[in-house]
Amino acid sequence: MRTSQYLLSTLKETPADAVVISHQLLLRAGMIRRLASGLYTWLPMGLRVLRKVETIVREEMNAAGALEVLMPAVQPAELWQESGRWEQYGPELLRLKDRHEREFCVGPTHEEVITDLARNELNSYKQLPINFYQIQTKFRDEIRPRFGLMRGREFIMKDAYSFHLSQDSLQQTYDGMYQAYSKIFSRLGLDFRPVQADNGSIGGSGSHEFHVLANSGEDDIVFSDSSDYAANIEKAEAVPRESARGSATEDMRLVDTPNTKTITALVDGFQLPIEKTIKTLVVHGAEEGTLVALIVRGDHELNEIKAANQPLVASPLVFASEAEIRAAIGAGPGSLGPVNLPIACIVDRSVALMSDFAAGANIEDKHYFGVNWERDLPLPEVADLRNVVEGDPSPDGKGTLVIKRGIEVGHIFQLGTKYSEAMKLNVLSEQGKPVNLIMGCYGIGVSRVVAAAIEQNHDERGILWPSALAPFQIALVPLKYETESVKQATDKLYAELTAAGFEVLLDDRDKKTSPGVKFADMELIGIPHRIVISDRGLNEGVLEYKGRRDSESQNLPIGELMSFITEKLSR
C-alpha cells in the first residue's frame, strides 16, 4: 500500500479529551475518530488492526469446535422480559420502540437471543454439546463513557454460548474455552493473566477473567510469585499471615477515646500499632429488619463481594445508616466493636487470630483495649471478608501474592440453568425426558483488545505493536523519492516484499513532507520494521534498517535484505 493512495491521518497534537495513552495514540495515529460520546469510527489503519484481532479470535474459536453465527444487534423486549432482565438491567440497556410501539433494546449481550435460538433449533440430546459464537457490535449506555475504546458505549465483542446436558460436559467445553482464550492472547503477543473471578450480573457459578497487564488498568489482579494461582481482587482468597493467635498479655480495660472516630485517630492518639485495631462495619442482614456487624483489621479493607456472599448478609450489600446503627446498638460509627454487641457478628480470619487488640466499646467515645477472644468474649462466626494485600501468602501454599493492574479483555462463565429455566429451554434426554440445558458463556472484548495492546506496548514516540497486530509489517521510506534511482530501487523492493507476502506501507509522500515527519509518523503508527532507501545508501550498496523497538539503525547490503527481513518476520 502506498501512502499516496491511503488515508494517513496522523495528528501532531494530542486531543484534549484523550486521557489514557491508548486513546491518545489511536487518535494521533489516525486509527479511530470520535463521532459522539463513546462512539468511534474505525479508519483504515485502525481497521486493519481490528481485523487481525478478529482473525485470530475466529481461527481459535473454529479450532475449538465452536460454530459461528450472527445475531441481530436489536432485540425484542419479550425475550428480556422472559429472562427477567428487562427490569433488572438498568439504564445501561438502551430501550426503544418501533413504529408499532413494540419495545426493543440494542443488545449489550446476547444470552436471551441465543437461548431463544437454541430452544427453536435444539430438540434432542444427540445435538449436544454445541457451542455457538459471533463477533458482533454491542451497545451499553454507559453514564460516563471514557478512555476511548476502553469504555465506550458501542464496542465489538466475540461472545460464545455453549449448551450441555451435564455439568461434566460443560466443564469439558469450559476447559476448552480456557485453553482457546490462552492461545488467542498468546498469539496476540500480550502479557496476560487468567484469574478466578466473580460472575457479577451475568449469573451462574464458575468464572475466569483474562487480564492484560498494564499500569493503567482499572482492575487489581492478584497472582502468586511462585505458582499459577491468580484471581481478581474481589475473588482472591485472603490467607492470614499468622499461623496461630498470640497469647494474651494485657487485661481488658475501658478507655475514654473522645473525638476518635477513625482508625487513624485511634492509632495516632494512643500510639497503637494499626495491626492491633479493628474496624466494625454494619450492614443489612439477609433477614428483613436485621443488621450484621462485619469486622476487619484496621489496616485491611472490607471486600464487599465477599461480604455480600455471606448467608447472614443481604445481597446486594447495603450499609446501615447511622440512625439504624444507633437504634440497634446505642452508639455510632467509630465506637463500635464485638464486646457486648447486640447484633449478629462476622469477623475476618485475620481478626480471629488477633490478641490484645483495641475495639470500640459500643459506648459513645469509648474503646476497650487489651481485648482477647475466648477470655473476654466468645469468638463469633469467622469468614474471609477482606481484600488481599501484597505479600499475603498464596492460597495454594506456594509463594506470596503480588498485585498488579490489569485490563479485562476476556471473561468465561459457567451459567448453569439460569437462562434455560427462565426461558424453558429443554431437550429430550436419552431416556425421553425433558432436561433443562446447562449453559456456558464466553466473551472477548475485541475492540478493547486493541486499546489494551497499546496500553501495554508503547513508548514516548508512539505504539509498539506486537507483531501479530501491526497494521503493516514493514514501512518503506524513500528519501527523495522523486530521484529516479531512489524511485526505481524503492519500487523494485516494494514489489519484491509484497510478492513475498509481506504487508508493506510505502511512504511515497512528496518532498513537502520531510524525512523526519515520515519517520515520526511510522513510529507513531507502530510499524515494526522500517527500511530507508537513499541515494547515498544505494551508492554504497546498502539500505538502512531499524526495528521499531531498536535504539539504533543498521546498514544492510541490498542483496541480504530479503533474507534478513524474512528471518525477522518468521520469529
Curated annotation (Swiss-Prot):
<dbReference type="InterPro" id="IPR044140">
    <property type="entry name" value="ProRS_anticodon_short"/>
</dbReference>
<dbReference type="InterPro" id="IPR023717">
    <property type="entry name" value="Pro-tRNA-Synthase_IIa_type1"/>
</dbReference>
<keyword id="KW-0030">Aminoacyl-tRNA synthetase</keyword>
<dbReference type="Pfam" id="PF04073">
    <property type="entry name" value="tRNA_edit"/>
</dbReference>
<dbReference type="InterPro" id="IPR002316">
    <property type="entry name" value="Pro-tRNA-ligase_IIa"/>
</dbReference>
<dbReference type="GO" id="GO:0004827">
    <property type="term" value="F:proline-tRNA ligase activity"/>
</dbReference>
<dbReference type="GO" id="GO:0002161">
    <property type="term" value="F:aminoacyl-tRNA deacylase activity"/>
</dbReference>
<keyword id="KW-0648">Protein biosynthesis</keyword>
<dbReference type="GO" id="GO:0006433">
    <property type="term" value="P:prolyl-tRNA aminoacylation"/>
</dbReference>
<comment type="function">
    <text>Catalyzes the attachment of proline to tRNA(Pro) in a two-step reaction: proline is first activated by ATP to form Pro-AMP and then transferred to the acceptor end of tRNA(Pro). As ProRS can inadvertently accommodate and process non-cognate amino acids such as alanine and cysteine, to avoid such errors it has two additional distinct editing activities against alanine. One activity is designated as 'pretransfer' editing and involves the tRNA(Pro)-independent hydrolysis of activated Ala-AMP.</text>
</comment>
<keyword id="KW-0067">ATP-binding</keyword>
<protein>
    <recommendedName>
        <fullName>Proline--tRNA ligase</fullName>
        <ecNumber>6.1.1.15</ecNumber>
    </recommendedName>
</protein>
<dbReference type="InterPro" id="IPR004500">
    <property type="entry name" value="Pro-tRNA-synth_IIa_bac-type"/>
</dbReference>
<dbReference type="Pfam" id="PF03129">
    <property type="entry name" value="HGTP_anticodon"/>
</dbReference>
<dbReference type="GO" id="GO:0005524">
    <property type="term" value="F:ATP binding"/>
</dbReference>
<keyword id="KW-0547">Nucleotide-binding</keyword>
<comment type="subunit">
    <text>Homodimer.</text>
</comment>
<dbReference type="InterPro" id="IPR036754">
    <property type="entry name" value="YbaK/aa-tRNA-synt-asso_dom_sf"/>
</dbReference>
<dbReference type="InterPro" id="IPR045864">
    <property type="entry name" value="aa-tRNA-synth_II/BPL/LPL"/>
</dbReference>
<dbReference type="InterPro" id="IPR033730">
    <property type="entry name" value="ProRS_core_prok"/>
</dbReference>
<dbReference type="Pfam" id="PF00587">
    <property type="entry name" value="tRNA-synt_2b"/>
</dbReference>
<comment type="similarity">
    <text>Belongs to the class-II aminoacyl-tRNA synthetase family. ProS type 1 subfamily.</text>
</comment>
<dbReference type="InterPro" id="IPR006195">
    <property type="entry name" value="aa-tRNA-synth_II"/>
</dbReference>
<dbReference type="InterPro" id="IPR050062">
    <property type="entry name" value="Pro-tRNA_synthetase"/>
</dbReference>
<dbReference type="InterPro" id="IPR004154">
    <property type="entry name" value="Anticodon-bd"/>
</dbReference>
<dbReference type="InterPro" id="IPR036621">
    <property type="entry name" value="Anticodon-bd_dom_sf"/>
</dbReference>
<keyword id="KW-0436">Ligase</keyword>
<keyword id="KW-0963">Cytoplasm</keyword>
<dbReference type="InterPro" id="IPR007214">
    <property type="entry name" value="YbaK/aa-tRNA-synth-assoc-dom"/>
</dbReference>
<dbReference type="GO" id="GO:0005829">
    <property type="term" value="C:cytosol"/>
</dbReference>
<dbReference type="InterPro" id="IPR002314">
    <property type="entry name" value="aa-tRNA-synt_IIb"/>
</dbReference>
